[in-house]
């Protein structure tokens, strides 16, 4: 019942926040302008932007330049952190390969971690690299999504100003929301301090080091921005990052909030601030139905437990790798949310999930469109929508058209490329891990689970998720460089292609009613969309899943 109430709250909050995002995205005057306008104007003066509207190419150019500059500065700081201030625990510099991986990870909103935060970063880099990139990567994803939505709902090549979009989103959404969440987490027991690690003497007389630091400020944006990287190595399974039952719900809800709201925002942009277009509701229904299906699957297999233990007379579900304070139910819920919304934070160890329970987060990342991350999740879903409309139109002999825009050969080539980037990166680099000498030494499990570890690592990297089957010994040159390359390519190539797609479509947009268009405003469309998503991704990844989690599940029942 608590999960049902939680999901109802998610839907209601998404509806409410989407109204606020409408004002932020479309520069609608509001009463709070008196607070935020002076801050924004100061930022515009500092960065030297004149707020001129940009064309699609200019928007993407500044998006890439901005991200490149942030990545370069972050890379340098990670290489010299031990010589800088705010390093009370005297943590050392990161190696070149690890610094590259960390930079690529947080720059792309992935937050894959091949280090433990307790020993791998200073407080300065935790705040000025990690937390900073958590804000800017989330805002960058939001900005390009809004640019795409403006194209789909408008009739002009002008899509706004990149710097204005990210500034308004950070100042008006991320910082205020993150501040509220941080204060709540502090009230629940999450530390926020610049003091060094605490050394205590236990009852047995042994000295123990307790790592803490500026955690609450990182935790809030970690979830709100669908980032996922933890201050500590064990992430949100630790009692500092996730102290209570209520903090667990707050963290889960905060990572769902903005991706869910963006779907309704799309509907409002298609219609009005007060009304949501039925097409956006049908997209939300498709996403939500798939989410519920995967959640139920994960719950079922985790509560079913391990048959090998049942043969020994040990009843019960799979509690391995889980916090007793959360149990199986909340752990499965968190697992499904963190991979559906491509956050990557964990409150249990995914490597300890049952084979098919662990396949749920893997498949969600392979789909990469069941809500997805900040902005890019909706962009990926819209590619599936266009594919569905195109195929359905051809099947019934109608001209492929989406929102009054004809989908022709040029657009379909770009749509196909955008769709293929994700599976190609996963499959090619997973194969390389078994071919390159020494790469497979990182595997800690033989047979099927070893394949699952490799597949999960590259799927998480390509989906910009960041969670992992952490039995993999991944802090090596091969794994640092390969996953870093995957994260960068999987982030930027699809975004560029998707903006090119809508830039091409917008030139064909008309407000005339087209009776020959495929209906996209009913539950039948949602059903067909779900079927196409499952079929397209299933045909792509099923052979690899057979060699991984499905094979492992069959092995348990031999």
From Swiss-Prot:
One of its GO terms (cellular component) is plasma membrane. InterPro entries: KdpA. Pfam families: KdpA. The chain crosses the membrane at residues 1-21, 60-80, 129-149, 169-189, 246-266, 281-301, 326-346, 353-373, 376-396, 415-435, 485-505, 523-543. It is found in: Cell membrane. The keyword rRNA-binding does not apply. The keyword Cell wall biogenesis/degradation does not apply. It comes from the Bacteria. GO terms for molecular function: P-type potassium transmembrane transporter activity; potassium ion binding. It is a multi-pass membrane protein. Keywords: Cell membrane, Ion transport, Membrane, Potassium, Potassium transport, Transmembrane, Transmembrane helix, Transport. Belongs to the KdpA family. Part of the high-affinity ATP-driven potassium transport (or Kdp) system, which catalyzes the hydrolysis of ATP coupled with the electrogenic transport of potassium into the cytoplasm. This subunit binds the extracellular potassium ions and delivers the ions to the membrane domain of KdpB through an intramembrane tunnel. The system is composed of three essential subunits: KdpA, KdpB and KdpC. This is Potassium-transporting ATPase potassium-binding subunit.
